[in-house]
Amino acid sequence: VTGESGLFADPFYSPGSDFISMSNTWTADLIQRDLKGEDIFFRTKFYTEVNKALYDNWMPIYINQYPLWGKTQVMVAKIFWDWGAYWSINTLLFTNNGLTDLELLKKLTAGPRSILQKYGELSTNMQRLFSDWGPLDTADLTERYTDPFDLDFLKQFQEDIVEKEFNRDELIAKFEENMVILEHIAAETFRLVSNKVHGTSMELTVDPYTMSLNGEDRKSKNSKEVLRDAHIAKEMRNMWLYPYPEKVMN
């Protein structure tokens, strides 16, 4: 959980203070429980496993992604995705005291189709998409500005962590709801990129867990086909700097 045996994030965007705060939260909780005479063996082991799972799920946003700096459209899409994923899962868990709620953590991590497993797999596949797209994003897109809060779903993710509190059942329901939104964001991002690179239809049905810009054959226990969502599609126009495909949803 902490110290030399702990985990630390690459400072791609920041110095990793989020993982420091998570580590401090677990450490403080364990110390308090130990001082009260509680047996903390299982809790310590479980916190360690959750810490590693969150770390492994999050590291793909950094690994081998430095070449994407300077790729304007890729980095806009990537930063918006990274923020959305972070706010809707990681931060929401922290701000609702979920890191020390064993029952909640068990429900989020149990099984290959658990929320945390799906989240990690989806996030990793999105980072593959950004990596594959990077060398193809060569346009000089200057004098453009896009605000993340022009996208309603990012605004909602932020409001959920700043203005609201959830009990355990509400939090699980919110995670499930957010995962569906993330799946649609991932699928719509792929449609935009694939249309730009390969000229494919914007009405393409996409599996966000197995999608590949290079046509790689990928398998997933969480595989699902995602149809186009009108609201998500409309919102994502605000982050697309290239000319938008002619046939779009109204």
What label would you give each PLM region?
Residues L7, W26-L99, L104:
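Active-site-proximal substrate-binding core of FAD-dependent oxidoreductases
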Residues Y13-A28:
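A short alpha/beta connector and helix-capping loop motif
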Residues G3, L7, K52, D56, ...:
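Alpha-helical context
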